[in-house]
Curated annotation (Swiss-Prot):
Testis-specific. GO terms for biological process: cell differentiation; chromosome condensation; negative regulation of DNA recombination; nucleosome assembly; spermatogenesis. This is Histone H1t. Residues 121-135, 147-156, 176-189 have a biased composition (Basic residues). Residues 32-42 have a biased composition (Polar residues). Residues 1-42, 101-211 are annotated as: Disordered. Phosphorylated in early spermatids. It comes from the Eukaryota. The keyword Transcription does not apply. CDD domains: H15. The keyword Nucleus applies. The modification N-acetylalanine is found at A1. PROSITE patterns: H15 (PS51504).
Length: 211
């Protein structure tokens, strides 16, 4: 009778130790839930990439989208519901525009706001063009200044040439005057010599008379 109460004392701690084992088993369930949420982001990326590649103006249908995703290596049959949820979320965010149909069925295309990358490239090109225009405007201004400098130099050279020509003309005029003045002096000298000759001619007669 004394050994009987010892057995239930051993069974009580065993029952107390079991609940923490059950709590540990609940943690992996939360991890699996987080792992299921991750593929939705990849699905939305694949959908946006497929629509950016498509050249259809009216948009891409759901069947064509599934084909593009399957070609990219995505399992469409297992993740059909995720594709539809991804399409709805993208339409709600404004990244996609539904051109036809309702809900997940129909055709979709990227909105203008969802493609900023090509616009950035287009914006960068005009910026480079503006810099080129500024450089060209600076270069265009420099030839004008060079032309103005050339004109100023030409005006200076022409003024110097005119001054040199006027100096030459004055020198030539002086030389001509100097040439003319000795000729006049020469012409005047013989006139002064004629009376002497007459005196010499008259002098012999006077000598004969004296004789």
């Amino acid at each position: 009778a004394e050994t009987a109460p010892a057995a239930p004392a051993d069974s009580v701690p065993a029952s107390v130790e079991k609940p923490p084992a059950k709590k540990r088993g609940k943690k992996p369930v939360g991890l699996t839930g987080t792992s299921r949420k991750a593929p939705s982001a990849s699905v939305s990326k694949l959908i946006t990439e497929a629509l950016s590649v498509s050249q259809e103006r009216a948009g891409m249908s759901l069947a064509a989208l599934k084909k593009a995703l399957a070609a990219a290596g995505y399992d469409v049959e297992k993740n059909n519901s995720r594709i539809k949820l991804g399409l709805k979320s993208l339409v709600g965010k404004g990244i996609l525009v539904q051109t036809r149909g309702t809900g997940a069925s129909g055709s979709f295309k990227l909105s203008k706001k969802a493609a900023p990358e090509p616009r950035k490239g287009k914006v960068k090109k005009p910026a480079a063009a503006k810099t080129k225009k500024l450089v060209l405007s600076r270069d265009s201004k420099s030839p004008k200044s060079a032309k103005a400098n050339k004109r100023a130099k030409k005006s200076r050279t022409t003024a110097a040439q005119k001054a040199a020509r006027s100096g030459r003309k004055t020198k030539e005029a002086k030389v001509k005057q100097q040439r003319k003045s000795p000729a006049k002096a020469r012409a005047a000298k013989p006139k002064a010599g004629n009376p002497k000759l007459t005196q010499q001619k008259t002098n012999p007669r006077k000598a004969t008379n004296r004789k």
